[in-house]
Amino acid sequence: MSIAWSSVFKRELRLERFLPRVYSTKVPDNAPRAADNEQWLETLRPITHPEQKKSDHDVSYTRHINVPLGEVTSVNYLQRYNKHKHSQGNFVDVRIVKCKSGAGGSGAVSFFRDAGRSIGPPDGGDGGAGGSVYIQAVAGLGSLAKMKTTYTAEDGEAGAARQLDGMRGRDVLIQVPVGTVVKWCLPPQKVRELVEREMRKDNNATLRSILGSTAVNLSVSSGSHRKKIQLYRHEMAESWLFKDKAKEYHENKDWFKDLHKKMEAYDHSLEQSELFNDQFPLAGLDLNQPMTKPVCLLKGGQGGLGNMHFLTNLIRNPRFSKPGRNGLEQHFLFELKSIADLGLIGLPNAGKSTILNKISNAKPKIGHWQFTTLSPTIGTVSLGFGQDVFTVADIPGIIQGASLDKGMGLEFLRHIERSNGWVFVLDLSNKNPLNDLQLLIEEVGTLEKVKTKNILIVCNKVDIDAEKSESFAKYLQVEKFSKSQEWDCVPISALREENIDVLKKKMFKCARQSEFDK
């Protein structure tokens, strides 16, 4: 189990230890006697009342922070402003999904009846808990294309007579490819409204500048080294459900006022446990390994109490019950980040796809026009029978101004963020390949970011103008710069398969550089 997941599961264990402190005592099980109910209701007195702002029972202190709009949305969902929206086949690597957990079922108001008496003791059962939304990373999936736009767990069923509890709502399980990162996000409609507002203020503003400069205020839990976004459920419309006799009748009775005061404390404890549970990491969940156990995204609401719990020596015929707690509705951004040892980076038509085709089992689309590659392609490279293998990802070409929202390559950098090394592919037939390399470095995040990776420079198309001294001079310029950065450099012709074996060995070394350094 990875460190990230162990922290998630440890948090669930802490929640289990916390719940007894919140409730102080357990709600009596089915068929409670009046004495059992009175004992339980009496223990609610010490629990903090909602009027008090903070106490030992408050489990979630929050504070507010501002984050850029771009961190809580995806440019792919701003279709009107995303000039290079694209797709290829069934490959989808970004989805925004609305998830909703189920509400708890309401407690029942019912009385035991038999032939000897028309009305007996209360026997209304509790409502069932609402279904929860779970997520699990599984091997064998390679795209987010089959994800739905909405996942809704079932509400819990209402309680019934004869102390029958309602059925629990059915859970929802979302299965995603390994390498998926899940982040909380704003609803797409809300984001579009914010972008349109900023566009009206400044017609020259770019989408990327708006996403970077517009602030979104979030409530986050404090007291932890990992910030968590505090999620909130809708407030309960009613705290009681009445049958036969109206709300106004009960509110005028002293015995009900006393009961209501105690149950306010009970409701407050439920709210506190919800606040503790309804949190999501600000940095998101990185599902970089197959999971044997799913993790809960949104927990369903707790079922309401039936009237059997309100039988006391003073209250003989409770014609009321508690409603189920609300579920939770949120939007999440799913981003697939492919897991490959190396990533190919280059200008459009530099020959990346041809290289991948020659060195691996992948069959990417190859053409003589820009943006032939419209989605990432991953190939597996073998150095020979029985020898080591490594994986290589090819992403769309990057053009000048990509960091200013031009082209399409930067949208796919997520697929090589995890890679141990980056392979920059240069077209040696271009006028100035060294300038091309420096442009690529600048567009993907400057030299400082590039230096965090193992780097290999590949000069492709050496067969073109091979007889001219200018071609060799251009290669020497690139090689000199590469050596100054302590990067390896190799000339090849992918089309003619020249120097391909040398390239594969150097790529393997780049992918496993840490092993060679030992």
Curated annotation (Swiss-Prot):
SUPFAM superfamilies: Obg GTP-binding protein N-terminal domain, P-loop containing nucleoside triphosphate hydrolases. InterPro entries: G_OBG, GTP-bd, GTP-bd_Obg/CgtA, GTP1_OBG_dom, GTP1_OBG_dom_sf, OBG_GTPase, P-loop_NTPase, Small_GTP-bd. One of its GO terms (molecular function) is magnesium ion binding. The keyword Nucleotide-binding applies. Residues 1-23 form a transit peptide. One of its GO terms (cellular component) is mitochondrion. Transmembrane segments: none annotated. Residues 89-339 form the Obg domain. Its main location: mitochondrion. It is a peripheral membrane protein. One of its GO terms (biological process) is mitochondrial large ribosomal subunit assembly. It is found in: Mitochondrion inner membrane. The keyword Protein biosynthesis applies. GTP binds at residues 346-353, 394-398, 460-463. Keywords: GTP-binding, Membrane, Mitochondrion, Mitochondrion inner membrane, Nucleotide-binding, Protein biosynthesis, Transit peptide. Disulfide bonds: none annotated. Residues 340-512 form the OBG-type G domain. Required for mitochondrial protein synthesis. May be involved in mitochondrial ribosome biogenesis. Belongs to the TRAFAC class OBG-HflX-like GTPase superfamily. OBG GTPase family. Interacts with the mitochondrial 54S large ribosomal subunit. Present with 189 molecules/cell in log phase SD medium. This is GTPase MTG2, mitochondrial.
